[in-house]
Amino acid sequence: MVRKLFNTSHKKELILDVDTTIVKIGTPKNVVLLTKWLDANGAIKEEGVFRVNGNTTTMEQIKKNFSQGKDDLTKYTSADIHSMAGCLKFILRELPEPIFTWDFYPIFIKIQCLQDESRKLFFLKMLIHGLPYTSRTLVFQLFGFLSKFSVHQDQNKMTPKNLATVFAPNVLRPKKEEDNFQLMNNQDSIGVIETLIEEFQYISNIQKNTLNSQEIKVKSVLPFDETTNAITQQSLVEDYLIAKANTPQESSSFKKNLPFKKGDIIKLLYIKNDGNFIGEINGITGNLSQTYVDIIDISELAEAFTLTPPPIPTLPIASTILHTPPTSSSSSSSSSSSSILLTDNQPKLCSSTPRINNSPSSFSPSLSSTTPQLLVQQSPRQSPRQIPSISLIVEPNNTNQPSFGHGTLQRTSTGYFSSKPLSISQPINMSKPTNMSPPTHHAMSMHNLPPSNTTRENHLPPLPTKPPPLTIPSSSSLPTTPIKQQPQQPIQQPLTPQNHHHHHHHNNLSSSVNTANTGNCANILSPNSDRYLSSRSQSSVHLSGSSSSSSSSSSSSSSSSSSSSSTSNRKFDFSLKSKSSKNSPSKNLPPQPTTTSTLTPPPPPTITTTTTTTTTTTTTTIATTPPPPSKPLPNIPVKDQQFNTLKRSTIEIPPPTITSTNINNNNNTINPRTLNYSFSSFSITYNNSQLGGQLSQEEPPGGVKSQSSYLDNNNLPSRNTNIPNLPPRPPPLNIPQQQQQYKPLPSPPQLQSPQSSLNQSLQIPLQQQQQVQQQKLTTHYILPPQNTNLSGKNLQRSSTSMLLNKLPPPPFSFNKN
């Protein structure tokens, strides 16, 4: 069947109006003449060509000669290069229809928006081939000339970008040039022309088949071989676009529409002037709208269209094709061995070969072949030097055929051999087998590994042994007799930093599950702490109680709280050897002593913190890193888990030794009155738990007791004292003398007895309270600055102005009035 592919019998008459003379141009003769003259006179090396304006008189003379049918340009010299270049732009601009027809304009703009450069080149190549014969010939002539300018762009200073900016408005423009539309698509038009100039060698490959021929033989349907799932290389005609239907269309006898369904693959035979297509499907030809289909690449049809590569000598291997969905995950492969062992217990891997595409999506201008090719997935045995691969040895399954990824497998005495490249997707045990079978003639010797009888599983190295978990009964069934813990087994592995790390990590994970094993030394010592501890001779760490697990909360029941806290009385003593035993194996260490745990209710929680005379509080914190070697190891108390369930608690802290001096005493005698601290609210953070309570102070050695309680802010007692070792306070604000008012302070209430109970609240006499309310005094409970002489006078200030100015509160009372 012979059919005209392009309507070449109808040649458009391009009308050019020059000096009111209508000139009929049947062929792009004048464009060809101008391009040949410019090429012959060295225009490709002229700087600023097509950018510098030419002589107006010369340009008008050339236009007049063309209008009269005179095409002799021999009288012009190289001095007229810019004039000839200006005439070329003028002729292209004044054509009634550009060489890229208006119907093709939206398609070119749409293709330019593609992100894949290889697909963009393929579509541009096919669209230019679909242009009318006259326009296609003119495109090849013009862009073949412009491509030479890009070669000599160092001399003419005209890059492909500059040339595209000059010629895009003349050759690729819409029919109705609206301002918004032109501004939006101007850059896309420039991009299309720039691509055509740069990739002209690739696009001009079409010219070999169709430029000089007006009719070609078209096959209605591409022959499809069901056995090989491929089409022959000779049967693929590259002169056609392939489209995929996105909207179904029914047949119509009047319009001769092509019937198709959504998703059908349609071969586009011709692009009409109105922008619609003439397509073919299943031997039926008809019209279809360009909005009903999407132009696709041949590489997207890999399932139905796969080209067969040139024949390659292959080895005789079995053709057992198995299909398994691929799994995606990352794994590591061994660099010393090219074979990977898989067992039946491990998940099977899918051997997926990356596509090697020499088709439209991977074309380059340097390719001489005009037919896109798609290479099938080749076997690494067929071309071992072309495709790096990792072959597999798969142990036989219980079934006749192994359920392995899709690939070609060959059964040998050692298992099934896969001849396809593989992308590893699961971590694999790379253990080397002990026995190796002799090489055979039908497979490579480096892959012949015997099947192992033992199951190789992917797991971590064995962790050090640990004492068995201690079962703690509920609080309702607590035994009366002590329970002895089993002696801990010695560690079988040397105490290397790596083993210590695994041991430490494993115990950290298990400590949140079972709180009975939190006394293990690995929970407290860091991975490198054995170096430091072993360097100190006769050093020991005493652990008292059990660290509270982070999984317990304040909302747990009372039974679980008492059961978890019943392990707090257990004591562990780990004695470490001297520095000489650092590198000795742990199996030579004596077994750890047996510890006795008595499950009795714990005493009320009490935190005792030692405070020195320099008012610095020493806080001990259990950390995973050892202290610096210069400091001795402190006794680390392990707090009870029951702290996480308490709402309030009384914490006893002995205060520093403070000498209280009465200011009004001239003999500088010790005033028996003590410092009274008031805390309206406070909270103590311990082990990610909030504890609140009432703070009281113990009696210092040789002193009197100090008590505190929750007091009303308006009934706070006052005090006058000097406290040493306090930071200096900024001087008070200088207030004018006329605004100062002085009023004596009431004496603070005396304690009922210096030997009162520790938790007894301070009772203010009723008469003293009434007196304070009558005087409307607000007592500030603030320590005075050090080295301040307050003898004689008390300054009264305004609390409002003091707060606004952010001044430190005075060490005396004041009246708001």
Curated annotation (Swiss-Prot):
Residues 318-638, 691-771, 783-817 are annotated as: Disordered. The record marks R51 as: Arginine finger. PROSITE patterns: RHOGAP, SH3. Residues 238-298 form the SH3 domain. Keywords: Cytoplasm, GTPase activation, SH3 domain. CDD domains: RhoGAP. InterPro entries: Rho-GAP, Rho_GTPase_activation_prot, RhoGAP_dom, SH3-like_dom_sf, SH3_domain. It is found in: Cytoplasm. GO terms for biological process: cellular component assembly; signal transduction. Residues 318-339, 359-391, 472-498, 534-568, 577-587, 607-624, 735-744, 752-771 have a biased composition (Low complexity). Residues 461-471, 625-635, 725-734, 807-817 have a biased composition (Pro residues). Residues 340-358, 396-438, 509-532, 705-722, 785-803 have a biased composition (Polar residues). GO terms for molecular function: GTPase activator activity. Residues 20-204 form the Rho-GAP domain. SUPFAM superfamilies: GTPase activation domain, GAP, SH3-domain. The keyword Ligase does not apply. It holds the Pfam family RhoGAP. GO terms for cellular component: cytoplasm. Its main location: cytoplasm. It comes from the Eukaryota. Rho GTPase-activating protein involved in the signal transduction pathway. PANTHER family: RHO GTPASE ACTIVATING PROTEIN AT 16F, ISOFORM E-RELATED, RHO/RAC/CDC GTPASE-ACTIVATING PROTEIN. This is Rho GTPase-activating protein gacII. It comes from Dictyostelium discoideum. The lineage of its organism: Eukaryota, Amoebozoa, Evosea, Eumycetozoa, Dictyostelia.
